[in-house]
């Protein structure tokens, strides 16, 4: 790096500076090594564990550091015994610019064509000030969020969790834990108890699908005119107002068609494994996985399903043919107070121009997913922990030794044979029912639009995209209240209608103005795209330490990867356009 800037939260002693400026990673590490060993030192960087960390450590150093991670994300690296590197993006789930006014990024930082790109000697005081402002924004965001979190959980010295989902869950537990899930012991201590059959949770786990995203039939890659996109305000928080399965009151039910219809009539939560048959004129919307991708247009269903979608299916053209497994539960309002309190708080903050409303938004949107946290296999990469494990006589019964690469030259790491990391917050029937309710809400609005003659081209979790509306108004409940719908406009635009749009596939579409200029490009997984999937596009990323270790390459290096759509890329068409 050209330089690194660090700002302490505050000056803890008279010799501490307000900011530290380092010209290389070695200088910063030398400073870190002199920090008092009797304290914990936590360093935050935004998206830091995928980018900034490589300014300090090489591939092997990162491999050898103890870490907290899931298969795709490192939440924390530990350096020595008392220094921790955490990624603020896991708490502040938006670009840093969302939390404060940033300046314009100097071109020499990001543009390889700039004559000063990579030239350390070209760094000016203005460049340093740009980065200083970044660090100020991050420091203020983290300290403000921590103060709010301490207030919400009622603990003066509470430290921030690693992720926004964990933060939301702890706030919910501290303020809204159901009293019926707690009891007092003979010693006067309050104990919290949740117990359920794992078999019931596993069934719901198989019914846990994400948001529905699709281009509607015969419209993929077709240019449509006068497009409009409507988003539902706070889709998941709005659905969390409903009743959900009570984990302490889960029972196995007689797996029969008659029992399902009785549970449906009673309006209680239930789930199971079902076989359904589509009838003519019925709605096609049930989730399935086909070729490892979500598919919503099947005319038969055989799998796990939660009660919101099954109830809707039975009311809209589907017949229940067989019940293979059935669970029921008593309903409980788990989140109503939580959602209403924080939604009202956010509205009040927005009304007063209080920027802290962004943190409340994070809290509202992050909670439900925590109940769907997956079990994970423990992965140990650092030599010290591996050595301790392998000194045990029976370590091979618990762990599998895996090579970093096929030639075994890059070393080994350990993976537990069983999923040993089991989140205590996990209860899949809740998470699966919330997402099921959201998909039903989406489908009911799509069906209403289609019934009234509107053309639906695309949907994504909480949004519906229409085209060629004419003067008709779609049947959404328009407004700014929780659960109402609102019109999405391109950034910086006041127009209601997008003159032309092309939807290629999930998470990939382009909006254009009347002059053919692109006003919005959505292309997931591709950072540098012009929105035309018939051409090769470029994704710019940073090589992570795992990839570097496997391939024997340098970590932290910018990588340009050519991305070609399997469905849309056409070499001949590209040649024609060039000629």
Per-region residue spans from a language model:
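Conserved acidic
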Residues: 2-579
């Amino acid at each position: 790096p050209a330089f690194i800037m660090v700002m302490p939260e505050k000056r803890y002693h008279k010799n501490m500076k307000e900011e530290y400026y380092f010209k290389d990673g070695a200088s910063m590490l030398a400073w870190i090594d002199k920090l008092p060993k009797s304290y914990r030192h936590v360093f935050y960087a935004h998206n830091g564990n995928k980018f900034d960390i490589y300014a300090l450590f090489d591939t092997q150093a990162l491999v050898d550091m103890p870490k907290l991670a899931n298969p795709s994300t490192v939440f924390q690296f530990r350096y020595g015994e008392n220094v921790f590197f955490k990624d603020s993006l896991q708490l502040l789930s938006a670009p840093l610019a969302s939390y404060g006014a940033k300046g314009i990024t100097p071109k020499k930082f990001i543009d390889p064509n700039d004559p000063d790109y990579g030239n350390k000697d070209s760094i000016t005081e203005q460049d340093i000030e740009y980065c200083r402002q970044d660090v100020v924004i991050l420091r203020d965001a983290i300290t403000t969020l921590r103060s709010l979190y301490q207030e919400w959980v009622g603990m003066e010295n509470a430290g921030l969790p690693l992720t926004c989902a964990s933060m939301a869950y702890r706030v919910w537990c501290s303020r809204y834990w159901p009293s019926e899930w707690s009891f007092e012991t003979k010693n006067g201590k309050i104990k919290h108890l949740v117990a359920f059959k794992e078999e019931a949770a596993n069934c719901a786990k198989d019914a846990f699908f994400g948001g529905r995203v699709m281009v509607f039939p015969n419209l993929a890659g077709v240019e449509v005119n006068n497009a409009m996109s409507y988003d539902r305000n706070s889709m998941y928080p709005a659905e969390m107002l409903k009743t959900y399965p009570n984990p302490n009151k889960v029972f196995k039910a007689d797996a029969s068609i008659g029992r399902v219809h009785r549970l449906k009539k009673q309006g209680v939560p239930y789930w199971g494994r079902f076989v359904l048959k589509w009838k003519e004129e019925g709605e096609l919307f049930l989730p399935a996985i086909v070729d490892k991708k979500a598919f919503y247009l099947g005319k038969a269903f055989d799998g796990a399903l939660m009660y919101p979608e099954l109830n809707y299916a039975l009311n809209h053209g589907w017949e229940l043919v067989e019940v293979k497994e059935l669970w029921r539960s008593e309903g409980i309002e788990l989140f109503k107070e939580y959602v209403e309190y924080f939604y009202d708080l956010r509205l009040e903050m927005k009304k007063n121009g209080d920027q802290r409303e962004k943190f409340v938004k994070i809290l509202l949107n992050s909670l439900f997913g925590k109940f769907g946290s997956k079990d994970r296999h423990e992965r140990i990469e650092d030599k010290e922990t591996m050595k301790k494990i392998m000194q045990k006589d029976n370590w091979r019964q618990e762990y599998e030794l895996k090579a970093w690469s096929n030639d075994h030259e890059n070393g080994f790491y350990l993976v537990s044979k069983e999923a040993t990391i089991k989140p205590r917050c996990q209860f899949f029937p809740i998470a699966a029912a919330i997402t099921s309710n959201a998909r039903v809400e989406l489908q009911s609005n799509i069906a209403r639009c289609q019934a009234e003659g509107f053309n639906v081209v695309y949907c994504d979790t909480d949004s519906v995209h229409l085209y060629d509306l004419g003067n008709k108004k779609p049947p959404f409940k328009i407004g700014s209240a929780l659960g109402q719908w609102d019109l999405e406009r391109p950034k910086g635009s006041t127009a209601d209608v997008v003159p032309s749009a092309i939807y290629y596939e999930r998470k990939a579409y382009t909006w254009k103005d009347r002059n053919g200029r692109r006003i919005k490009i959505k292309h997931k997984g591709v950072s540098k795209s012009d929105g035309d999937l018939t051409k090769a596009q470029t994704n710019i990323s940073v090589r992570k330490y795992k990839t570097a270790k496997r391939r024997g390459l340098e970590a932290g290096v910018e990588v340009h990867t050519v991305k070609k759509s399997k469905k849309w890329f056409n070499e001949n068409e590209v040649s024609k356009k060039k000629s």
